[in-house]
């Protein structure tokens, strides 16, 4: 290489380039590696310890993720490699220019200019430790350098207008904070003799709490800014370099619920709190100030917190809310008057319809009730004897029903005497069975077009009041029914009752009625939401339509939402009934569906069957025999098989044999000659049907019903200790054939109440069988039936039953049997 090589790299001319070959004998290389190492050790610049406040970049409004932050590590390299490393990071557009002079913006100066430029590049004041200074908040727990215009957290003090706050440092709150702030200084910083290397490692360890000079959250949010004494301008902290920013300090340790500050109470356990209220406020809001770093966030997110089922949490919250006591009602009742307490005898005089009164009533009330019943029985016997000799009077059963109604009215008047019921009385709404309502199978043998039983036998729906004595706050409504009992209803049929509600307040009430079940068996037929005027009353119609054989129990709620008033009424009913029908080859039905006629050659022996094949429940039957004068045969003159009272199982029948003494038959023929003809003059279209057909020698009265209702009557008699007579009939004094042993009411069954007596009276039925010894009289009675039916060519019978709410019209119009000639 004789000629000098042209080298215009830095616009300079080198004097000489040694390009002679290397001598093989020279052991040392041209490149001295040890010299380079020594050069690096001499010229290395240590990174300042407190590099978190360094940086020449302003903060960004968004917080980048920790994993996405790129850290640039600066190292001092040899001058020969510095230019190449710098040029490697330059853009491609800049590197496309081969002239280094255009990049460094100087044309002359030589090697000294390059060194000066390099020193400026690597100067401490121009060094960027991190590409994004925001990462210092996540890496070392320190807040990023910010100014008041680019800070994402709200400023506590206005830097220009707000005067310095007057903080009472002697307050127990701030005094406690300052005391705890001093406690946060680690012990390693308090010992001056500690190793410096250990201190540096603690500074770089994120798990070790930072000191007060490095923590951005160590001071209270209330006194984090220092102010100048002369002006209100905030004074920046002095432990920073010029050109670096530091925003207001704040505490985040108590914001997050899962923060370790809520679990670690070791710092404040040794302090004595002034009051319990201050301790509660301190534990929830004034938590210890501590720097939040990455490891703390990781422990919170990946701690021992277990996932909880949402439904389980909601159920637990519902149970806690249900366990809370109800809100007290602080309304002042200015119209409430104190009613004096009545004597015990007067308060318990109405125990016939009271379900919650004491079972052991006083002797006075029992004596009065017994006397009243004896008087009624005497009146019944006298009326029966008078009816036997008077052809224009009503039948015996009608008289007994009238007597029972009178006895009920007397009992009702005694209950209402003295201000009505007490607050412990209970009235049960039951289906009615009075003169205006009839049964399809002839309870008392009367027919009617009425189709709905709406009132109880004791008129508890419309006349029995719930009482005038109230405990506590006055109630806006007076509900006369405390319980609704439907009894036994046939499957597929419907029975309706009415529940009366009266507004006793001085303003309108929006009343809502509902049931606690969605079953269609019980339905409220009227509007479920009704406005009731003051001092007015309404009636809710409730229907019971059983779909299968069984017992149905629901709760009906009547409430006034605006006044937080609610009244619950239990309702129960049985699906399925017994259906008794007499069967015999010689038996024929008369015009009345509950009356039959039968011809027998011997009056001393009467035999027939009672069938319950169409019934779905067990039933009972009780038999009584009367002569043509409507006198009941004495027990010594008649015998029954299997017994006067017996049980017929469902889907079965039972044969009945009756034996009459011959001596009574002869006596009856002599004494009954004149009365039999007079009884035949009674009108067949009268509302009170005769119980014996003209020419009949005897008639049998069969009373029947569901055995489950008679069992409740027996339990009521055991509970009250009083004998129960229903319309003069005794259903409990003797043992019925095939009846079961009386047991206590099982748990969950409707409770035995005094109203079960009225429910039984409204549910039992009966039919009559007329016995003829002469075929001529028997044919006359049956032909009279056909003649009465054919007397009106357009006669329609309306069949009704107490167990229906619809009227079934059976077209039994008889068309005369006439022959029409064929016209050609």
From Swiss-Prot:
User: Which stretches are tagged as biased composition: Low complexity?
Assistant: 81-98, 349-366
Polar residues composition-biased segments:
59-70, 207-225
- Variant or mutagenesis effect after changing residue 615 to E: In or188; results in centrosome duplication defects resulting in failure to assemble the bipolar spindle
Annotated coiled-coil positions are 111-131, 304-324
Known consequence of changing residue 573 to S?
Answer: In or183; induces centrosome defects leading to defects in bipolar spindle assembly
**What GO biological process, any one, is recorded here?**
centrosome cycle
Q: Could you name the domain of life of the organism this protein comes from?
A: Eukaryota
Coarse class of the protein's main subcellular location = cytoplasm
Cellular localisation = Cytoplasm, Cytoskeleton, Microtubule organizing center, Centrosome, Centriole; Cytoplasm, Cytoskeleton, Microtubule organizing center, Centrosome
Which is one Pfam family of this protein? Cep192_D4
- Any idea which GO molecular function terms this record carries? molecular adaptor activity; protein kinase binding
Question: Can you list the GO cellular component terms from the UniProt entry?
Answer: centriole; centrosome; cytoplasm; pericentriolar material
Where is region (Disordered) located?
16-98, 189-252, 342-372, 433-455
Would I find Coiled coil among this entry's keywords?
yes
Record InterPro entries: Cep192_Spd-2-like_dom, Ig-like_fold
- Give the Acidic residues compositional bias ranges: 16-27, 35-44
Q: Which keywords does this Swiss-Prot/TrEMBL entry list? A: Cell cycle, Coiled coil, Cytoplasm, Cytoskeleton, Developmental protein
The protein's role, per its UniProt record: Required both for centrosome duplication and maturation. Required for pericentriolar material (PCM) recruitment.
- What binding partners and quaternary form does the record give? Interacts with sas-7 (via C-terminus); may be recruited to centrioles by sas-7.
The protein's name in its UniProt record: Spindle-defective protein 2
| Organism, as annotated | Caenorhabditis elegans
């Amino acid at each position: 290489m004789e000629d000098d090589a042209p080298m215009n790299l830095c616009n300079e001319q080198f004097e000489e380039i040694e390009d002679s070959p290397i001598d093989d004998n020279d052991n040392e290389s041209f490149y001295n590696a040890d010299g380079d190492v020594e050069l690096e050790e001499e010229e290395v610049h240590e990174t300042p310890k407190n590099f978190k406040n360094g940086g020449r970049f302003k903060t960004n409004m968004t917080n980048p993720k920790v994993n996405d932050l790129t850290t640039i590590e600066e190292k001092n390299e040899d001058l020969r490699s510095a230019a190449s490393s710098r040029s490697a990071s330059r853009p491609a557009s800049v590197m496309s220019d081969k002239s280094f002079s255009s990049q460094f913006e100087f044309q002359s100066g030589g090697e000294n200019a390059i060194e000066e430029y390099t020193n400026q590049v690597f100067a401490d004041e121009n060094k960027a430790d991190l590409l994004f200074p925001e990462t210092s908040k996540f890496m070392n727990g320190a807040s990023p350098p910010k100014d008041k215009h680019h800070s994402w957290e709200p400023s506590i003090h206005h830097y220009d207008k707000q005067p310095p706050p007057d903080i009472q440092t002697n307050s127990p709150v701030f005094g406690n904070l300052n005391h705890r702030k001093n406690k946060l200084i680690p012990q390693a910083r308090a010992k001056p003799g500690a190793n410096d290397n250990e201190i540096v490692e603690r500074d770089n360890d994120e798990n070790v709490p930072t000191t007060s000079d490095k923590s951005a959250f160590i001071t209270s949010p209330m006194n984090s800014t220092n102010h100048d004494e002369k002006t209100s301008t905030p004074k920046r902290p002095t432990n920073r370099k010029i050109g670096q920013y530091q925003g207001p300090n704040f505490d985040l340790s108590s914001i997050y619920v899962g923060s370790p500050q809520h679990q670690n109470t070791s710092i404040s356990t040794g302090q004595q709190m002034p009051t319990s209220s201050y301790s509660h406020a301190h534990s929830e809001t004034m938590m210890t100030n501590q720097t939040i770093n990455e490891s703390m966030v990781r422990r919170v997110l990946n701690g021992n917190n277990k996932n909880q089922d949402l439904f389980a949490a909601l159920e637990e919250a519902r149970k806690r809310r249900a366990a809370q006591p109800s809100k007290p009602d602080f309304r002042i009742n200015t119209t409430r008057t104190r009613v004096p307490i009545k004597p015990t005898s007067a308060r318990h005089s109405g125990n016939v319809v009271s379900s919650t009164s004491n079972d052991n009533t006083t002797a006075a009330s029992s004596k009065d009730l017994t006397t009243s019943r004896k008087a009624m029985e005497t009146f019944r016997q006298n009326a029966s004897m008078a009816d036997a000799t008077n052809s224009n009077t009503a039948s015996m059963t009608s008289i007994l029903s009238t007597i029972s109604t009178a006895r009920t009215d007397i009992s009702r008047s005694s209950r209402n005497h003295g201000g009505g019921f007490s607050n412990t009385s209970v009235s049960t709404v039951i289906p009615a069975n009075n003169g205006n309502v009839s049964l399809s199978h002839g309870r008392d043998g009367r027919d009617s077009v009425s189709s709905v039983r709406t009132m109880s036998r004791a008129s508890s729906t419309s006349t029995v009041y719930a009482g005038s004595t109230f405990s506590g706050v006055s109630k806006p409504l007076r509900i006369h029914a405390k319980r609704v009992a439907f009894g036994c209803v046939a499957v597929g049929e419907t029975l309706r009752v009415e529940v009366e509600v009266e507004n006793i307040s001085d303003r309108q009430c929006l009343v809502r009625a509902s049931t606690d079940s969605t079953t269609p068996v019980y339905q409220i037929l009227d509007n479920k939401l009704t406005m009731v005027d003051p001092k007015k009353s309404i009636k809710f119609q409730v229907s019971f339509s059983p779909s299968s054989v069984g017992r149905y129990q629901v709760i009906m709620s009547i409430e006034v939402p605006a006044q937080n008033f609610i009244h619950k009424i239990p309702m129960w009913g049985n699906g399925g009934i017994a259906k008794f029908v007499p069967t015999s080859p010689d038996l024929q039905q008369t015009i009345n569906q509950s009356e039959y006629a039968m011809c027998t050659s011997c009056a001393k022996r009467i035999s027939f069957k009672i069938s319950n094949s169409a019934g779905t429940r067990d039933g009972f039957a009780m038999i009584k025999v009367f002569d043509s004068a409507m006198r009941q045969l004495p027990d010594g003159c008649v015998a029954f098989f299997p017994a006067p009272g017996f049980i017929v199982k469902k889907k079965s029948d039972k044969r009945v044999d009756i034996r009459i003494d011959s001596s009574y038959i002869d006596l009856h023929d002599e004494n009954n000659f004149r009365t039999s003809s007079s009884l035949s003059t009674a009108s067949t279209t009268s509302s009170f049907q005769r119980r014996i057909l003209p020419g009949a020698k005897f008639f049998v009265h069969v009373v029947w019903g569901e055995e489950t209702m008679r069992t409740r009557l027996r339990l009521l008699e055991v509970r009250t200790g009083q004998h129960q007579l229903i319309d003069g009939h005794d259903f409990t004094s003797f043992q019925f054939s095939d009846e079961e042993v009386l047991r206590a009411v099982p748990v969950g069954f409707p409770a035995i109440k005094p109203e079960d007596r009225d429910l039984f009276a409204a549910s039992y039925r009966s039919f009559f069988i007329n016995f003829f010894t002469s075929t001529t009289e028997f044919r006359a009675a049956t032909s009279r039936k056909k003649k009465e039916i054919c007397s009106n060519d357009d006669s329609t019978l309306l069949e009704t039953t107490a167990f229906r709410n619809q009227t079934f019209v059976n077209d039994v119009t008889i068309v005369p049997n006439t022959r029409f000639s064929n016209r050609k």
